[in-house]
């Protein structure tokens, strides 16, 4: 199942060259590789920090600060719970900024729905930290969230 899920994220990565954010999609693909095929969860979560920064910069209509990539090796020094807190803060900032800056449109609704599904996925992952993980439930939220974020990231009108 992991290979099929990874192929879906790879498809979203390819789709991102059409109207998405290829850098965010590449970081997502890399994060998922670490989370699905290795035991290096800190590396996966560190790449998800970069994903959130890429989306935040898009909403701010600013280029991705290339120096931010140096967060990756530094983040590996932090314990996993601290990385999770940093990720959660960036993700909630992403949601907040998207709700404020994105003008009303069909694309906005799809983008925000993608963020909602992503949040549901992350809450499921957090819940699974205390219980037996349910990968199918995680991917039920994650796969469509990545598709919606990919196809709407560049077309959402921003104030």
List where the protein language model places each region.
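Polytopic alpha-helical membrane-helix bundles and their juxtamembrane interface segments
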Residues: 1-159
């Amino acid at each position: 199942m992991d290979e099929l899920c990874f192929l879906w994220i790879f498809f979203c990565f390819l789709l991102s060259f059409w109207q998405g954010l290829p850098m965010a999609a590449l970081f997502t693909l890399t994060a998922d590789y670490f989370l699905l095929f290795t035991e290096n969860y800190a590396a996966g979560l560190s790449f998800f920090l970069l994903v959130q920064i890429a989306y935040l910069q898009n909403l701010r209509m600013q280029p991705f600060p290339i120096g931010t990539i140096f967060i990756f090796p530094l983040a590996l020094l932090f314990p996993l719970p601290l990385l999770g807190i940093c990720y959660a803060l960036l993700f909630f900032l992403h949601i907040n900024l998207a709700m404020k800056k994105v003008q009303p449109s069909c694309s906005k609704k799809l983008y925000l729905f993608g963020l909602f599904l992503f949040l549901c996925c992350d809450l499921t992952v957090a819940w699974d930290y205390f219980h037996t993980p349910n990968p199918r439930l995680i991917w039920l939220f994650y796969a469509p969230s990545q598709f919606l974020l990919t196809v709407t990231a560049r077309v959402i009108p921003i104030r």
